[in-house]
Amino acid sequence: MKIKNSLKALKERHRNNRLVRRKGRVYILNKTNPRFRARQG
């Protein structure tokens, strides 16, 4: 999982990326291609 300051560019890298908020953190999750997962930090 990558940790990035800004997730806007990462969200557009794959069409199945989903923006999810969990416990005050923002994640990008992708079920079809998990290598695009990222967390904002």
Curated annotation (Swiss-Prot):
GO molecular function terms noted in the UniProt entry: structural constituent of ribosome
InterPro entries: Ribosomal_bL36 (IPR000473), Ribosomal_bL36_sp (IPR035977), Ribosomal_L36_bact (IPR047621)
Cross-referenced HAMAP family: Ribosomal_bL36
Superkingdom of origin organism: Bacteria
One GO biological process term: translation
UniProtKB keywords: Ribonucleoprotein, Ribosomal protein
Family matches, as PROSITE patterns: RIBOSOMAL_L36 (PS00828)
NCBIfam families membership: PRK00831.1
Protein name: Large ribosomal subunit protein bL36
Species in which this protein is naturally found: Bartonella tribocorum (strain CIP 105476 / IBS 506)
GO cellular component: ribonucleoprotein complex; ribosome
Gene: rpmJ
Protein family (similarity comment): Belongs to the bacterial ribosomal protein bL36 family.
